[in-house]
Amino acid sequence: MVKHIVLYTLKEGVDKKAAVEIIRESLEPLVGKIPGLLKMEIRQAYQGMDYALYSEFETRESLTAYASHELHLAAKEKFWHFLDSRVAADYDC
């Protein structure tokens, strides 16, 4: 299993609560629709960054496939424009 964690900041002036809801509604339903994506959680952060994404994948290959999957790319189009910065970490379990 691979765990994928991403921390984001949003652009200045973006409503953080509304943005996190859009991101959550776009990405969390992908579980069960993209092979190898086992779990997805998106939450507003209270310290350091604006929100955190936590996900689990069956394998490294399934994480790689997720990144370019058409459903993931379509979901990103709904919110990518209000993201400012991103830090990610992936690790095996």
Question: Model-flagged regions — what are they?
Answer:
Residues 1-51, 58-68, 91-93:
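Short S/T/G/P-rich N-terminal loop/turn motif that feeds into the first structured element of a domain
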Residues 36, 76-91:
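Conserved short beta-strand edge segments in small beta-sheet-based binding/regulatory domains
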Residues 69-73:
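Short, conserved loop/turn and helix-capping segments at secondary-structure boundaries
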